[in-house]
Amino acid sequence: MQEVIIYSDGACKGNPGRGGWGAVLVAGTNEKELFGGEANTTNNRMEMTAVIEALRALKRPCTVQVYTDSQYVQKGISEWLPGWKARGWKTADKKPVKNADLWQELDTLVQPHKITWHWVRGHNGHPGNERADALANRGVASLAS
C-alpha cells in the first residue's frame, strides 16, 4: 500500500461563524494542498471536514499517518466512535452525537485505509500543521465578499 501523510486543520472566525479547512497530503515526493470554506459552521466541523476531504482525495487504499491539532478529531475517531456506533449514535449520556453526519462519513472513509492518528500541539511550529493552518485560513478568506 502507498504511504501517505496527511496534515489537517480547521479554522473558524466566530464559533459558529465563517470557517475554513485545510489539508496537506504528502506521498513520497508528491504533495497536494486542499482547502475550502463554509459560511456558517463550527471549528470542530471544519477540523473534521479537513480530514474527510483529505481522505476523499485518496484514490486507492493507503497506509496513512494523519496529523491533527484537534483532540476532538483524534479522540473521536480513536476512542469515542466505537461506543457511539454501539449506542446508535448516542453519547454515554444518551444524547445525540454532535456532528454525527460528519462522524458517519469519516467512519466510512477510513475503512479502506490503514490509518494511524497523531495529535500535534497547534501553533507550535510543526511545519505540516502550520501549512494546514494557513490553508484553513485561506478557506475562511475565500468566503470574504
Curated annotation (Swiss-Prot):
Annotated GO MF terms: magnesium ion binding; nucleic acid binding; RNA-DNA hybrid ribonuclease activity
Catalytic activity: Endonucleolytic cleavage to 5'-phosphomonoester
Necessary cofactors: Mg(2+)
Pfam families the UniProt entry points to: RNase_H (PF00075)
Localisation per UniProt entry: Cytoplasm
Residues covered by the RNase H type-1 domain: 1-141
EC number, UniProt record: 3.1.26.4
Residues bound to Mg(2+) 2: D9, D133
Cofactor binding, per record: Binds 1 Mg(2+) ion per subunit. May bind a second metal ion at a regulatory site, or after substrate binding.
Chief location: cytoplasm
Assigned GO CC terms: cytoplasm
Transmembrane segments: none
Disulfide bonds: none
Any GO BP: DNA replication, removal of RNA primer
Protein purpose: Endonuclease that specifically degrades the RNA of RNA-DNA hybrids.
Family: Belongs to the RNase H family.
PANTHER family: RIBONUCLEASE H1
Oligomeric and partner information: Monomer.
NCBIfam families: PRK00203.1
Protein name: Ribonuclease H
